[in-house]
């Protein structure tokens, strides 16, 4: 089940990390012969790098799925600069509408006549949790499922009602209803 997260703004974390980097540079310059001050500078510098690792940019119509050592934490769907736990791993998932140009399939219709059928399918990810965790490759999954649906559609209806006079909906005349 998808869980939407609202992370904090990344601008404050970016400001804090820049201040830490500047202060660590000051400590490096000020503590030329003082190993304790130089060590503090290193600690501040690596703390700033750790904070920067938690920054993420999400573009419009994209999302990030967050994991914490293999456990699903949530999904961020808002766009902008955000700060999350630096130990989270993230997976990008596009929420944009995508086109799938199905290849032309040779199948038999309901009456047993050979026909050639194809489809152009527009789809987009609705649930990022299912897209990432319930299938291996969701783009390949959509392609295979759409081909199976087109095959099922072709064998469920007659192409034309010349042989089946009782057919109300055909693939040729009832395209909108099919």
Describe the function of each predicted region:
Residues 44-48, 99-102:
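Short Pro/Gly-enriched beta-strand edge/turn motifs at strand-loop
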Residues 61-64, 74, 100, 105:
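Membrane-bilayer interface helices and TM-boundary transition segments
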Residues 26-45:
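Hydrophobic alpha-helical transmembrane segments
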Residues 50-63:
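Aromatic-capped interface at the extracytoplasmic side
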Residues 14-26, 45:
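Hydrophobic core of alpha-helical transmembrane segments in multi-pass integral membrane proteins
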Residues 88, 95-178:
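Amphipathic, interface-forming alpha-helical segments with heptad-repeat character
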Residues 63-88:
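Membrane-cytosol interface motif
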Residues 1-18:
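N-terminal membrane-targeting/pre-transmembrane regions
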